Amino acid sequence: MKSYKTLIFIIVVIVLLAAVCLFFPSDGVPFLGRRLFFPTLKEVLSPEKSVSVDEKMRALEESIKMQAITDSINTARETARQDSIRFYKKFFTTHSARFYLPADDYSFFDTLFEAMEQCKTDSSIVHILHYGDSQIEEDRISSYIRQRLQKQFGGMGAGLLPVMQPIPSASVGQSASGAMERYIIAGMHQNRAPSNRYGILGQFAIMSGNGSISIRSQNYSRTQDNVKKWNVVRLFVGTNTTPLSATLISGKYSKTKSIDAPNSSPTALTWYLPSPTKQITINLTGNAELSAVSLDGHYGVNVDNIPIRGSSGTFFSQIDGNSISLTAKTLNVRLVMLEFGGNMMPSITQNNIQNYMDILARQINYFHKICPQAKVILIGPADMSTKIRGNLQT
């Protein structure tokens, strides 16, 4: 038989079977005491899939196992969380190395962490001021805290920097040139200014004419990653007796900000760079008090390293609060860490201890007044060990 005849035969058979499927009664027909059934077109074209009971049971068992694993993980996490809560409750109330919190209130820092957690969703920033003596120079301690917090909550850059920086840092390199003079309220390099407008860093520079500030990221092995770039730059100006012009240059980017008239109130000039950078120069013209420069990201947390060599932290209440308030508000300062006491140790007596405590209490109250949203931590001098007959003792 020729192939086309075979094809015609197959088509005829299919058509006949389809006709039978279409017209055969759905309830069948009786035949010799039995009932004959024939599938409908729907049953032929869309047959019901058979279900394997074994496959169903295996899938159910897998689902039960996965749910058991998930429940076990959730239970372990909740147990770990409860264990952590119990540990820190005990730590904050009984441990010898604990944070001494007001009324042992372990929720004392909740508002701080809430603010840091909101940084990403609100595109906001939070700053932590870390004041100290020479123990925190070169961005020691601050850099570690900054890196951990920026990894958790976002952020970049080194935070607040003085306009004129005589102390080297592991995070950024700085230079300043032109008609500038540096004033600092306390410490070994104390140079008192004609006013008490020392600003948030306890130091500022007076510029008369032209000046330039250059900042670049460092690349030492101990330089933390997040500090190497920034894309928001702020220049905090205390007062200016003439119009002030400030041009920020970074690669091909160049933009000028200005204060058009003399101003006796603090001002912040802000540049939002199109992309993160590692180096900037700010060229200035005018007569002004320059309080600080800050390097940040568009959102996140920053820790400001503010060392004052030779200081015991007793000077803050001498600073004009207005020279601090604008900077603290602009940067959303939520925590102030005061790490002092080492320079008092050589001359300490019981009477001196009480006097020093009273002075530090005034400094804490001062920060509560000018930074009402900020918590304050006082970190005292560490107990340093020494070798006695070959053994380390305190």
Task: Briefly describe each language-model feature range.
Residues 186-195:
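Charged heptad-repeat coiled-coil "rod" segments that mediate homo-/hetero-oligomerization
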Residues 86-102, 106:
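N-terminal regions that are enriched for targeting/export leaders
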Residues 71-72, 83-84, 96, 111, ...:
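Coil residues (strongly favoring Ser/Thr
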Residues 1-57, 195-234, 238-254, 296-394:
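Alpha-helical cap/lid subdomain in secreted, periplasmic
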Residues 52-58, 62, 262-276, 383-386, ...:
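Short, charged N-terminal helix-start/capping segments
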Residues 99-183, 187, 212, 219-309, ...:
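Serine-esterase "nucleophile elbow" of acetyl-processing enzymes
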Residues 49-57, 78, 82, 114-121:
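Hydrophobic, well-ordered secondary-structure segments
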